[in-house]
A protein has these predicted regions:
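Generic alpha-helical hydrophobic packing signal
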Residues: 16, 61-63, 105
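Alpha/beta-hydrolase active-site loop
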Residues: 84-118
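Generic detector of contiguous secondary-structure segments
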Residues: 3-5, 9, 13, 43-62, ...
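Short, surface-exposed "cap/lid" segments of acyl-processing enzymes
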Residues: 25-76, 80
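N-terminal cap/lid segment of alpha/beta-hydrolase-fold proteins
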Residues: 1-28
Length: 119
């Protein structure tokens, strides 16, 4: 299984979106699952890596990410050092972040042979 962690996706609101991908590297197009964890958590919380690995082993291209205003930073992605960003977070920003992740994977040349954008 191929895992790329802490990929920085540029966000619309001047905050990076820290992203992980999990997949079986075999140059076969796979359906994409984008996991939006919610409840102001982190992409690395609890069993999320185990869940990502399970989806990847089942033949999916699995993406999980931290919302840009979840309170974490690139240097400290599993803590709350950026309380101002956390306080300014809202549903619209999270929808924008999801759109940025969709745009990023849809145009990322590195993964084009591994993802299915047609279905």
């Amino acid at each position: 299984m191929k895992t790329n962690k802490n990929i920085i996706v540029e966000g619309k609101h001047n905050k990076p979106i820290l992203t992980d991908v999990f997949y079986l590297e075999n140059k076969q197009p796979k359906p994409i699952v984008i996991f939006c964890h919610g409840y102001k958590g982190f992409k690395d919380w609890g069993a999320w890596n185990l869940m990502a690995e399970t989806f990847a082993k089942a033949g999916f291209f699995f993406i999980k990410f931290n919302f840009s205003h979840n309170g974490g930073t690139i240097e400290e992605p599993i803590d709350f050092p950026d309380l101002e960003a956390f306080g300014n977070n809202n549903y619209s920003k999270e929808l924008d972040d999801l759109g940025n992740v969709i745009d990023w994977i849809s145009t990322n040349i590195d993964y084009q042979k591994e993802i299915n954008l047609d279905d």
